[in-house]
């Protein structure tokens, strides 16, 4: 059986290719970062980022409190501060499906980045000992592709340009108008990260079982949102995740 993947629950899903900086301050997650830094191989410095269902507590409810599909994050940079916190930079790597979750006692706990907050930031306040680190058995998911992906990608890219124009630049993305990726899978994840939609819909995109399915869902969402913004002046008021979409 593979080694359990340490989990870092957040209030929004990560996607593959997304650059996610984090300020690690809770003891359990500081210990997790140190554990990753002790790994001699860069590719082994991996932990799981998964979104928590609204109003749920993953420590008490386990998998029931978490969405089924998350994304592993690779630790790219880490700086330990004088007070013991870590400033780290991670990149979304590969999707996984939760099989089981177990709280493992540790001397470490949490982090946040901008609008992205830990799933249970106040949980440690009333505990006599540090909250445990969640570790999960997971199944890593392959990304199915098909011949229809290229056509769908062209359609989604066109709708994404219209959507960004309607929003008036509110979509955070590091790619310019003429730099939208041609790779269908990369495009599907860029749109997943950049759209201003509720968490459940972003999770639906992430959980799609193929690039074609994700692009098809994204195409519909982009069309819907562009109409709402353009015709009803209904600009979304949702916060955009405090992370940087990357086409790498």
Residue ranges of each PLM-predicted region?
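N-terminal low-complexity, acidic/polar interaction/targeting segments
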Residues: 1-248
């Amino acid at each position: 059986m593979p080694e359990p993947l340490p989990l870092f629950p957040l209030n929004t899903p990560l996607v593959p290719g997304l650059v996610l900086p984090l300020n690690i301050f809770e003891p359990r997650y500081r210990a997790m970062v140190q554990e990753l830094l002790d790994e001699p191989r860069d590719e082994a410095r991996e932990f799981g980022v998964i979104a928590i269902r609204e109003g749920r507590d993953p420590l008490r409810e386990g998998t029931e409190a978490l969405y089924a599909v998350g994304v592993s994050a690779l630790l790219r940079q880490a700086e330990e501060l004088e007070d013991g916190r870590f400033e780290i930079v991670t990149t979304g790597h590969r999707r996984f499906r939760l099989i089981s979750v177990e709280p493992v006692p540790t001397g470490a706990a949490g982090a946040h980045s901008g609008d992205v907050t830990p799933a249970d930031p106040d949980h440690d306040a009333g505990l006599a000992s540090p909250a445990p680190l969640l570790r999960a058995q997971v199944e890593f998911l392959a990304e199915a592709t098909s011949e229809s992906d290229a056509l769908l990608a062209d359609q989604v890219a066109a709708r994404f340009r219209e959507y960004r124009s309607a929003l008036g630049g509110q979509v955070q993305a590091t790619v310019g108008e003429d730099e939208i990726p041609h790779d269908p899978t990369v495009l599907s994840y860029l749109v997943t990260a950049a759209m201003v939609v509720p968490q459940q819909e972003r999770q639906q995109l992430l959980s799609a079982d193929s690039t074609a399915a994700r692009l098809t869902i994204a195409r519909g969402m982009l069309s819907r949102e562009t109409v709402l913004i353009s015709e009803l002046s209904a600009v979304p008021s949702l916060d955009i995740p405090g992370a940087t979409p990357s086409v790498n």
